[in-house]
């Protein structure tokens, strides 16, 4: 009978959590535009980016960025929280000792006690502690995946800021050259006006062009300063001048043939999707813990040690004492609190499911956007070159 009861309890433990919901992201089997080549997920940033100055800047950012440091500390915190929750599956053993002097009417006595005890070890028949452990593990894995997502986002932000600084510098130099040309044109028109060859109209027009060019120079100086400030913030320290690109960067990646992959690969390659999936799993574990609270909490308490009224006889064989016993606790009427907790956990799971589906859809959109830009980048570059030549 005891074995059957234990088997029934273990079966109940396994059924508390319930089935995991199935995500309905509704994404196509292929992208609107595709590209063949090496998957970017298989490349590290050191191989992906061609300019070694950018690679060194990224190394500094990964070592010093405060957001990434916070994400790493969150992992440590989640890991310790998981360890605490996992330890709840094991009994807590403590040592105790006391001396009691009392008088119960027959003369004062001194009693000495020393021993070991197990304090309220919960027998997890319904899987409550196990569900809490699963929740802590999934939360830890979600935090680790979120840190990976933060790192990938940081790499993209630093690379973009580094390139923006390069472009702003190139535009500033072009604006300086334009200003010099406009000043030369103004001086020429001023001389022609002074000797009476031309009217004042060309002088005024040239002066307007000069002031416009000066305004452009001031704007681009501001852009250079802002780009450098943002880059320093992302990196977490002042970026050395030797690592900054003063000229326009013409080659960004080492490999011009980057494959798009398949939408199904996003689930494994995107850490933000993995983080959302782990959060969904953690929400499911919370449901199991909430349902387990509907059943009695059974705890075991035990102790063993020595007790004597004479300190010299404390550790003799006749002074050994022990005790063990279970306790059971079941709230009879709690005004629906436990049922409400289950409903809250189920709602949290639906929220996590919605977030998971959104993360898949957002990732799919981001890939499609990048492919759309890449598909038309050749036409845009050709148009820009023709515009410059004209």
Pin down the residues of each PLM region:
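Short, conserved catalytic or interaction motifs in soluble domains
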Residues: 15, 123, 160, 236, ...
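Short, acidic/charged, Gly/Pro-enriched secondary-structure junctions
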Residues: 69-87, 96-100, 281
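Short loop-to-helix capping motifs
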Residues: 51, 64-67, 122, 157, ...
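Small/polar, glycine/serine/threonine/aspartate-rich low-complexity segments that form flexible
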Residues: 35-36, 40-49, 54, 59, ...
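Outer membrane beta-barrel translocator domains of Type V secretion systems
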Residues: 94-128, 132-146
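Sec/SRP-type N-terminal targeting helices
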Residues: 69-70, 86, 123-151, 201, ...
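Terminal intrinsically disordered/low-complexity segments used for targeting and assembly
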Residues: 1-63, 133, 137, 221-268, ...
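Periplasmic alpha-helical coiled-coil/stalk elements that build and connect Gram-negative outer-membrane
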Residues: 129, 145-262, 373, 377
């Amino acid at each position: 009978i005891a074995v059957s009861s234990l088997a029934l309890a273990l079966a109940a433990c396994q059924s508390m959590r319930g089935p995991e919901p199935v995500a309905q992201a509704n994404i196509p089997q292929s992208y609107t535009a595709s590209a063949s080549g090496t998957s970017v997920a298989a490349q590290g940033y050191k191989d992906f980016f061609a300019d070694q100055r950018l690679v060194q800047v990224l190394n500094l950012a990964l070592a010093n960025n405060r957001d990434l440091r916070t994400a790493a500390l969150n992992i440590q915190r989640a890991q310790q929280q998981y360890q605490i929750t996992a330890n709840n599956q094991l009994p807590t053993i403590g040592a105790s000792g006391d001396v009691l002097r009392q008088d119960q009417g027959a003369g004062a006595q001194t009693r000495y006690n020393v021993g070991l005890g197990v304090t309220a070890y919960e027998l997890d028949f319904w899987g409550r502690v196990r569900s809490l452990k699963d929740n802590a593990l999934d939360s830890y894995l979600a935090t680790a995946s979120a840190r990976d997502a933060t790192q990938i986002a940081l790499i993209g932000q630093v690379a973009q800021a580094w390139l923006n600084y390069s472009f702003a510098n190139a535009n500033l130099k072009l604006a300086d050259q334009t200003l010099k040309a406009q000043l030369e044109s103004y001086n020429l028109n001023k001389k022609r006006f002074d000797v009476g060859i031309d009217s004042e109209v060309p002088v005024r027009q040239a002066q307007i062009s000069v002031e416009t060019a000066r305004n452009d120079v001031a704007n681009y100086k501001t852009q250079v300063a802002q780009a450098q400030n943002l880059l320093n913030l992302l990196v977490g320290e002042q970026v050395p001048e030797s690592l900054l690109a003063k000229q326009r960067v013409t080659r960004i990646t080492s490999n011009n043939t980057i494959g798009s992959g398949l939408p199904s690969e996003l689930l494994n390659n995107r850490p933000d999707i993995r983080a959302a999936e782990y959060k969904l799993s953690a929400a499911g574990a919370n449901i199991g813990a909430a349902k387990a609270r509907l059943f009695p909490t059974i705890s075991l308490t035990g102790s063993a040690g020595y007790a004597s009224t004479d300190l010299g006889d404390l550790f003799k064989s006749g002074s050994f004492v022990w005790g063990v016993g279970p306790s059971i606790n079941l709230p009879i009427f709690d005004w629906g609190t436990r049922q409400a907790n289950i409903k809250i956990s189920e709602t949290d799971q639906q929220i996590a499911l919605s977030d998971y589906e959104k993360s898949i859809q957002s990732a799919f959109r981001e890939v499609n956007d990048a492919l759309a830009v890449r598909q038309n980048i050749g036409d845009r570059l050709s148009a820009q070159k023709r515009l410059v030549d004209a």
